[in-house]
């Protein structure tokens, strides 16, 4: 109440923030006349001037007014687009590291040029993050003309670029790319063996387009790089045959308060999208699988596969969560993004769920993959020194943006007043009535020529409504995951007279719906039909203004056409679309018909936002039924009772603001539930993130070539101290120390047989120092033989290889820990606290193994001089006195032997690097919107027990690292 009164007197916080920027907007405008007087060369030279001033101590804030004015003038000259004052405000909001909420059609793409240019002047790079490759290419080409005019370099990161192309793109001043590609490049860089192979620079400043989609909707989807697992697919087939034999039950209230009973073999909780076996179901499965107790530790894999198969059968439906389409190796399961309706061909559900769906659908089951590297978008984007975002719908999630990312949301005023009419929801009893009446309204609007965009929540529902419209004789386009390739073309013409477009949620982003049609798209199509457009390679594309040719893309292919011809065709089309625009405006603009409320208000707002852009008229209406998931699951009994009181008859809707408010309350409840799920994920991933930062930080030190000899010697010292503590504890008298075991420990770990007589009268500290001195001398002998440079390179390669292998195993252990940690709640323990505690223990154990394995590799690595090994190995020692070792007197190696030894070590490092490169080619990339298509997964060749050990020791695998 008090907040409302204060807002009326002083304005809201958002209004005050926007008002505070108006003097800066005026200052930018004041520079416009003098900048217009500059030649193109002088205007572009401002970039050099700004960089020089930064070098002399000026801050980016000091340059903001002048830099924004320069970009505004460059936009006018190069793009024929002058930034509106509200766009300048949007640019300032982004520069401050906040989220700018700008309505559809307000020019977010152009707004980004202002902070991009200003922040690129600092020389550390700016990343512009988009939701798909199409937008990354389009925006880099479109806005790239402006940046290149001002002397900045522009790069774009899309799938199928090699490392050098990626590196060049990241070294540009401004880099466009998808969230997937940026995240995967970060993970890939932390799997490389050479610093020169790394492609990313520092994470300086990122502007995330459609920030709500990337940082909210996809926050629960981690990016995963995986390699092939050895697990068989037989269990999936066996369990898949059994699940259909189970009978669905329900949860029934007992006589006592809080008492619950279950019937059947399993139950479904639609509110939380989960399924659970009943006691009867568990007993039936144990009998059918013939495995005894399903919850015995030895049956943990069976239990896991059963739970996933149950989910696949009862929670995941074809043409809703996924579609079946032809792939390279036959039919395949492709996920449909629940928020956009787009296909996600590169993405697979984890933990065996995708395989369970494949078994259910009878398509070829792909083997589960083992995670090699993973990160959530939440933790990736929090690495940037400064983060900003743009979207048309962020205000409803403002609290989450601030709590998780410390990002404030500022709503930018529209350039022209919004005059869209938002009609009250129409609620029917059944889904059949809802679709029947929605189709009638679509036909009525279509009959008078008004364009209609229809929103549905799934492929299945879009095709159902399409069938009804066909029967009514309404000509229309269908846009869903099955024909997404035509998305941009269909959406761009959805504002034409008589157009009816039935779409899933995917029509919400990327392409404006212009009333009367999009003249640019029409001109592209006409140029292609007339065959006057010349196909180009990417290298031939010109970004700067070209008086002879106009460049454009179509279906990710580059073209150019003579500028005079383009201008002629465009002028004709523009005159036509302008005339049609006025006719559509007279009819009332674009009308939105939504056939269901989404769980998130943002998705509903995105659909509404397609109408009424830039001051155009428009209208929207939602058609709902009591059978819709949101109303049925989350509306509750109060909603049902309210409907009955209002009185419902067949084909007679209830049109009530009270109902609309109740629906919004249900949506808020779902959003709160989803926020808790994302927050819960982040709490667990923060544990992994700290460990990832430690491991990746260590790798980075190695890649940057820091001298690791001291680190290796510290490892040696630490291992010796562990052995001394274990075999010669303070609590025991020296006569009871386990000296023989100590000797064997050192022999096994370092390949060195210590002289027990030499240690007989020494204290623990003296023993540690003596053993360390002997091992250090042995290591120095190897270094003297091959040279310091070669041994340093070998240390680096060995440590990287060991870290990667141990990290891979650690991620598997962490996955297994996370799967079962929820059960700790039954023992009155906090699962998160337990997870933190046990994951720390796992991490400590991994770091110890890294040290042990690294030292063992380095000490056992065979150096061949061309005349046999230089140093003895444990299984090659001659039998002799167990307590004494006669020190071998070895002549100094010849120069020829040194060269042979050096060559051996260099061959080893080269072989390891080649092996790593082959492994990198076999990786699979999973996550986000699936725009990164997986590369072929090829199982690595298994090492036989009698094969030479890959570590290079020269021994058989079974006697070295296979022991």
From Swiss-Prot:
Residue stretches of biased makeup (Acidic residues): 874-886
Binding site for ATP: 87, 105-109, 512
Domain of life: Bacteria
Enzyme class: translocase
The protein's name: Protein translocase subunit SecA
Job of this protein: Part of the Sec protein translocase complex. Interacts with the SecYEG preprotein conducting channel. Has a central role in coupling the hydrolysis of ATP to the transfer of proteins into and across the cell membrane, serving as an ATP-driven molecular motor driving the stepwise translocation of polypeptide chains across the membrane.
SMART domains, per database record: SecA_DEAD (SM00957), SecA_PP_bind (SM00958)
UniProt xrefs under PROSITE patterns: SECA (PS01312), SECA_MOTOR_DEAD (PS51196)
Coiled coil (UniProt feature): none
Subunit structure: Monomer and homodimer. Part of the essential Sec protein translocation apparatus which comprises SecA, SecYEG and auxiliary proteins SecDF. Other proteins may also be involved.
Swiss-Prot/TrEMBL catalytic activity: ATP + H2O + cellular proteinSide 1 = ADP + phosphate + cellular proteinSide 2
Cofactor binding notes: May bind 1 zinc ion per subunit.
One GO CC annotation: cytosol
Cofactor (UniProt): Zn(2+)
Protein family according to the UniProt entry: Belongs to the SecA family.
Annotated SUPFAM superfamilies: Helical scaffold and wing domains of SecA, P-loop containing nucleoside triphosphate hydrolases, Pre-protein crosslinking domain of SecA
Subcellular location: Cell inner membrane; Cytoplasm
UniProt membrane topology term: Peripheral membrane protein
Binding-site positions, Zn(2+): 949, 951, 960-961
GO biological process: one example: protein transport by the Sec complex
Origin species: Solibacter usitatus (strain Ellin6076)
UniProt EC number: 7.4.2.8
Transmembrane segments: none
Pfam families assigned to the protein according to its UniProt record, in alphabetical order: P-loop_SecA, SEC-C, SecA_DEAD, SecA_PP_bind, SecA_SW
């Amino acid at each position: 109440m008090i907040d409302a009164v204060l807002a009326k007197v002083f304005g809201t916080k958002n209004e005050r923030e926007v008002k505070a920027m108006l003097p800066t907007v005026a200052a930018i405008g004041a520079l416009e006349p003098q900048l217009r007087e500059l030649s193109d060369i002088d205007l572009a030279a401002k970039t050099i001037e700004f960089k020089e001033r930064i070098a002399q101590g000026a801050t980016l804030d000091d340059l903001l007014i002048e830099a924004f004015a320069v970009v505004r003038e460059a936009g006018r000259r190069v793009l024929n687009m002058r930034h509106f004052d509200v766009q300048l405000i949007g640019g300032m909001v982004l520069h401050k590291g906040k989220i700018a909420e700008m309505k559809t059609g307000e020019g977010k793409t152009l707004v980004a040029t202002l902070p991009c240019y200003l922040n690129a002047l600092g020389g550390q790079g700016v990343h512009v993050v988009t939701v798909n490759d199409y937008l990354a290419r389009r925006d880099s080409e479109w806005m790239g003309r402006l940046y290149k005019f001002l002397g900045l370099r522009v790069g774009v990161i899309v799938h199928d670029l090699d490392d050098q192309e990626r590196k060049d793109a990241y070294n540009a001043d401004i880099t466009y790319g998808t969230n997937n590609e940026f995240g995967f490049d970060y993970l890939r860089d932390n799997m490389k063996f050479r610093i020169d192979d790394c492609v990313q620079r520092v994470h300086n400043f990122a502007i995330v387009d459609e920030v709500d989609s990337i940082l909210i909707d996809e926050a629960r989807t981690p990016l995963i790089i995986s390699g092939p697992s050895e697990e068989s697919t037989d269990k999936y087939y066996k369990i898949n045959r059994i699940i259909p034999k189970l009978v669905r039950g329900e949860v029934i209230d007992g006589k006592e308060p809080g008492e619950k009973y279950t019937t059947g073999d399993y139950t479904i909780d639609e509110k939380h999208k989960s399924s659970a076996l009943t006691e009867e179901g568990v007993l039936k499965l144990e009998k059918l699988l013939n495995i005894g107790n399903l919850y015995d530790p030895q049956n943990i894999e069976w239990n896991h596969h059963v739970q996933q198969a149950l989910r696949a059968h009862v929670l995941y439906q074809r043409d809703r969560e996924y579609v079946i389409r032809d792939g390279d190796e036959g039919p395949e399961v492709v996920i449909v993004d629940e928020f956009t309706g787009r296909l996600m061909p590169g993405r697979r559900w984890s933990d065996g769920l995708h395989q369970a769906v494949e078994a259910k659908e009878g398509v070829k089951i792909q083997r589960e993959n083992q995670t090699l590297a993973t990160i959530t978008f939440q933790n990736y984007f929090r690495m940037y020194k400064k983060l900003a975002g743009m979207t048309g719908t962020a205000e409803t999630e403002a609290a989450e943006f601030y709590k998780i990312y410390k990002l404030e949301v500022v709503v930018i005023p529209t350039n022209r007043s919004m005059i869209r009419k938002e009609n009250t929801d129409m609620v029917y009893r059944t889904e059949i009535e809802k679709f029947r009446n929605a189709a009638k309204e679509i036909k009525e609007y279509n009959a008078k020529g008004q364009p209609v965009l229809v929103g549905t929540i799934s492929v299945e529902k879009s095709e159902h409504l399409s069938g009804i419209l066909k029967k009514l004789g309404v000509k229309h386009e269908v846009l869903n995951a099955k024909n997404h390739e035509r998305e941009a073309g269909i959406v761009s013409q959805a504002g034409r007279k008589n157009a009816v477009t039935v779409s899933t949620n995917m029509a919400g982003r990327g392409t404006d719906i212009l009333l009367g049609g999009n003249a640019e798209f029409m001109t592209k199509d006409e140029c292609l039909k007339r065959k006057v457009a010349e196909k180009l390679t990417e290298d031939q594309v010109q970004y700067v203004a070209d008086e002879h040719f106009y460049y454009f893309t179509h279906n990710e292919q580059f073209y150019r056409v003579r500028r005079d011809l383009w201008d002629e065709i465009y002028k004709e089309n523009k005159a036509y679309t302008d005339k049609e625009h006025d006719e559509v405006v007279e009819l009332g603009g674009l009308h939105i018909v939504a056939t269901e409320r989404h769980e998130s208000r943002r998705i509903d707002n995105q659909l509404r936002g397609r109408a009424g852009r830039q001051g155009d008229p428009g209208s929207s209406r939602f058609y709902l039924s009591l059978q819709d998931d949101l109303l049925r699951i989350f509306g509750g009994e109060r909603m049902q009772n309210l409907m009955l009181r209002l009185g419902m008859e067949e084909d007679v809707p209830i049109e009530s603001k009270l109902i609309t408010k109740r629906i919004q309350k249900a949506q808020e409840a779902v959003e709160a539930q989803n926020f808790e799920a994302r927050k819960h994920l982040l709490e667990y991933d923060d544990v992994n993130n700290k460990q990832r930062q430690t491991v990746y930080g260590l790798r980075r030190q190695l890649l940057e070539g820091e001298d690791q000899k001291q680190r290796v010697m510290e490892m040696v010292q630490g291992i010796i101290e562990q052995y001394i503590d274990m075999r010669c504890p303070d609590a025991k008298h020296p006569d009871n120390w386990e000296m023989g075991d100590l000797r064997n420990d050192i022999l096994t770990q370092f390949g060195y047989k210590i002289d027990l007589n030499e240690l007989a009268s020494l204290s623990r500290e003296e023993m540690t120092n003596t053993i360390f001195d002997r091992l250090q001398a042995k290591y120095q002998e190897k270094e003297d033989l091959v040279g310091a440079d070669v041994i340093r390179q070998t240390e680096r390669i060995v440590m990287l290889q060991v870290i990667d292998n141990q990290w891979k195993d650690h991620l598997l252990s962490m996955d297994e820990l996370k799967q079962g940690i929820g059960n700790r709640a039954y023992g009155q323990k906090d699962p998160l606290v337990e997870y933190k505690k046990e994951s720390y223990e796992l991490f400590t154990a991994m770091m110890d193994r890294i040290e042990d394995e690294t030292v063992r590799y380095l000490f056992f690595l065979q150096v061949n001089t061309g005349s046999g090994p230089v140093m003895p190995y444990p299984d090659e020692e001659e039998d002799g006195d167990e307590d004494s070792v006669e020190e071998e007197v070895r002549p100094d190696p010849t120069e020829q032997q040194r060269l042979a030894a050096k060559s051996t070590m260099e061959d080893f490092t080269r072989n390891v690097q080649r092996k790593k490169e082959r492994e990198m080619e076999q990786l699979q990339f999973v996550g986000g919107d699936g725009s990164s298509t997986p590369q072929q997964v090829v199982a690595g060749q298994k090492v036989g027990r009698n094969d030479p050990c890959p570590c290079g020791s020269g021994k058989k695998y079974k006697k070295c690292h296979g022991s």
